[in-house]
Amino acid sequence: MPTTNIKELLEAGAHFGHQTSRWHPRMKKYIFTKRNGIHIIDLEKTVVMLDKACNYINQVVSDGGKVLFVGTKKQAQEILAEEAKRCGMYFINQRWTGGILTNFHSIQSRIDYLVRLEDQQARGDFSRLPKKEAQKLGEEIARLNRTMGGFKEMTRLPDVIFVVDPIKEKIAMAEAKRMGVPLVAMVDTNCNPDEVDYPVPSNDDAMRAIKLICSKMADAVIEAQNAMKVTEVETTGEAQAETAG
């Protein structure tokens, strides 16, 4: 059964590409037509490509893998965080800090520092500090959480990265390629789909389109997680039955 349908994509405005003067020739196979100087994306192909991307995400999670959701453009920030939290995966929705993938050890030390500060705050250690110093540390926690809060529990490189806008996230894209982390991404008509392992042709500016695609990715994660729980329960039941027998 397809992940979505043309009607749902149309209602989200996923078919509207960029001005024809701002296109990438590699997107030609995903473009249906031109209308009023705008490229229109072929949603039949979007349905197929989204299905492939979601199946891949589902398989990665079924194998115990982790997904990192990335989208720092303003209209994607809140949506991306909501969907990543809904499926219990990592996210970056503010600024991509250079080295998150290529210098993960260094980034991990910053995360450890953040976690230590939060532990100290939770224990009430800050109350014993001068007011100004406690306030400064509180601000430091807030600052670090803005950039790292969405992935502070990530102890190794993610198994796949989902990106809302490859052009906006070019540093993340470059780091993923360098480290061999597969990429799933929404690709608008100004993007090069060849740079993505699992491209999903779609408007990447409209909030409704971003919400739709992000939610489908999260659904694919949740579906895999639920299937794993069922398998675990069945395995436990079989083991108990064998023991009882």
UniProtKB/Swiss-Prot annotation:
GO BP annotations, alphabetical order: translation
Which Gene3D superfamilies has this protein been placed in? Glucose-6-phosphate isomerase like protein, domain 1, Helix hairpin bin
One GO cellular-component annotation of the UniProt record comes to:
cytosolic small ribosomal subunit
The record's PROSITE patterns line, in alphabetical order, gives: RIBOSOMAL_S2_1 (PS00962), RIBOSOMAL_S2_2 (PS00963)
**Keyword set, alphabetical order:** Ribonucleoprotein, Ribosomal protein
Which molecular function GO terms apply here? structural constituent of ribosome
> Pfam families from the xrefs?
Ribosomal_S2
Q: Which InterPro entries match?
A: Ribosomal_uS2, Ribosomal_uS2_bac/mit/plastid, Ribosomal_uS2_CS, Ribosomal_uS2_flav_dom_sf
Q: Does the keyword Glycosyltransferase apply?
A: no
Family per similarity comment = Belongs to the universal ribosomal protein uS2 family.
Q: Which HAMAP family match?
A: Ribosomal_uS2_B
Question: Which protein are we looking at?
Answer: Small ribosomal subunit protein uS2
The top of its lineage is: Bacteria, Bacillati, Chloroflexota, Dehalococcoidia, Dehalococcoidales
